[in-house]
């Protein structure tokens, strides 16, 4: 079994609680920044969505999961 998943944890600031962000499955912290885990396959779309909502990307960290069983 070989399983690889490429995901990224993105720290976003500048998002404010509103009708659109209320529909998200993560809360906006009082510091004004949120951490969002994004799979590589949706990375571009999610960054565009964050930009449309007025967010600013503060940090991006890769999260790699690899399982190799022979």
Swiss-Prot record:
GO BP annotations, alphabetical order: photosynthesis
The organism's place on the tree of life at top rank: Bacteria
Keywords, comma-separated and alphabetical: Antenna complex, Membrane, Photosynthesis, Phycobilisome, Thylakoid
Domain CpcD-like: 5-63
Cellular component aspect of the GO annotation: phycobilisome; plasma membrane-derived thylakoid membrane
Main location (coarse class): membrane
Membrane topology of the entry: Peripheral membrane protein
Subcellular location: Cellular thylakoid membrane
Function noted in UniProt: Rod linker protein, associated with phycocyanin. Linker polypeptides determine the state of aggregation and the location of the disk-shaped phycobiliprotein units within the phycobilisome and modulate their spectroscopic properties in order to mediate a directed and optimal energy transfer.
Family: Belongs to the phycobilisome linker protein family.
Record-given protein name: Phycobilisome 8.1 kDa linker polypeptide, phycocyanin-associated, rod
Gene responsible for this protein: cpcD3
């Amino acid at each position: 079994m070989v399983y690889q998943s490429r995901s990224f944890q993105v720290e976003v600031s500048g998002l404010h609680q509103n009708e659109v962000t209320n529909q998200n499955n993560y809360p906006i912290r009082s510091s004004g920044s949120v951490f969002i885990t994004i799979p590589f396959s949706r990375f571009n779309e999610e960054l565009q969505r964050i930009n449309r909502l007025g967010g600013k990307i503060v940090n991006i960290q890769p999260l790699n999961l690899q399982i190799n069983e022979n």
